[in-house]
């Protein structure tokens, strides 16, 4: 119980398992914060055989999240990445995850042949037509994702308002 799953476009936390069906407390999609909307969705057990089942919490309690931060082409990329990485690494939720993951990664690699060499937050860089896209990638518990993202965005905006970084504006 309480696994976060997705099946047939329904995302939710399993709250009841019965003989013929199971119930999930539905959450919104990633674009809408993946937070509970209060609806209980009854899903027939037959869906397990008809649709792909994504379990967000079976192998690990944490999933990889990505936030896209756009900056202008003339921005100081390395300085901006350093500031954002410091913000992410200082987040209280994210800070403790790599230490907690060591045993989970070892256990999962035995059962699922999953290997992760890098559990710490990282930023990837891509140049688009008129701006630079920084893809900030970090581990987070699915139920804490929105709060963590909110905290990171507030701190990024503070750095922008204090003129320490430049954000791309269309």
Feature annotation, model-predicted:
Residues 1-102:
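Soluble accessory domains appended to multi-pass membrane transport proteins
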Residues 75, 85-86, 93-170:
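Solvent-exposed, non-transmembrane regulatory segments of membrane-associated proteins
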